[in-house]
């Protein structure tokens, strides 16, 4: 049985403080009570995220080199990204983020982390660049991410969540373009063509 990394959730005033110190324009943030409530909601869903990670691992057919995945949660509105995996619990306008949005965004970043483990990932990006030039690099990357995420949405989250994600992406052209390609070509076809993954 394939070993799945343990997802561990962390907060760090030092990590968060560095973001605050180096920003010329100070980002919005939620207060401590709101932050702790959101942190607890995320931690309470650890087994859900472990289940999603098992599904992602199965879809990609990967073997993990890591024993754990660290997730750093911050109260600042600085976005969400995969290395180090950082989850902002605050919207741009200083509001608490909805738990459904956080679940979808964290799943997205877990997919990024899983793709990096795939032995054909670098080769796949080169082939995507060849097939979809002159699209930007961010589009190539997210074709693969969205292809995996579609399968999670359809089996775990529901298509209404996928529609929300697609709508959210419309303000970011590379993400939106990646969704267009995945919807046109189909996630299974994309994953088989570029990664050799059959689902």
Feature-to-residue mapping (PLM):
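Acidic/histidine-rich, surface-exposed loop or edge segments in extracytoplasmic proteins
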Residues: 5, 11-41
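Auxiliary, metal-adjacent structural segments of Zn-dependent hydrolase domains
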Residues: 27-84, 156-157
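Soluble non-cytosolic domains of exported or imported proteins
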Residues: 43-50, 97-101, 105, 135-139
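Sec/Tat-exported extracytoplasmic proteins
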Residues: 56-60, 114, 118, 149-156, ...
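Ser/Thr/Asn(+Pro)-rich, low-complexity disordered segments
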Residues: 78-80, 110, 125
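Compact alpha-helical subdomains of small soluble proteins
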Residues: 79-84, 91-93, 99, 161-199
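Active-site recognition of the HExxH zinc-binding catalytic motif
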Residues: 100-119
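Post-HExxH zinc-binding segment in Zn-dependent metallohydrolases
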Residues: 125-174, 178
């Amino acid at each position: 049985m394939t070993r799945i990394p343990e997802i561990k959730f962390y907060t760090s005033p030092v990590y968060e403080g560095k973001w605050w110190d180096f920003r010329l324009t100070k980002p919005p943030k939620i207060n401590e009570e709101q932050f702790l409530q959101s942190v607890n909601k995320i931690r309470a869903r650890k087994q859900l995220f472990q289940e999603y990670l098992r599904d992602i691992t199965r879809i990609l057919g990967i073997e993990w080199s890591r024993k754990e995945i660290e997730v750093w949660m911050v109260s600042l509105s600085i976005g969400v990204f995969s290395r180090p995996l950082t989850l902002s619990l605050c919207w741009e306008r200083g509001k608490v983020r909805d738990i459904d949005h956080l679940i979808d965004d964290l799943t997205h970043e877990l997919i990024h982390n899983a793709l990096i483990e795939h032995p054909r990932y670098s080769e796949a990006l080169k082939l995507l660049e060849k097939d979809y030039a002159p699209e930007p690099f961010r589009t190539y990357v997210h074709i693969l991410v969205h292809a995996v995420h579609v399968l999670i949405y359809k089996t775990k989250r529901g298509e209404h969540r996928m529609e929300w994600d697609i709508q959210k992406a419309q303000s970011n052209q590379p993400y939106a373009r990646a969704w267009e390609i995945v919807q046109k070509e189909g996630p299974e076809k994309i994953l088989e063509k570029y990664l050799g993954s059959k689902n």
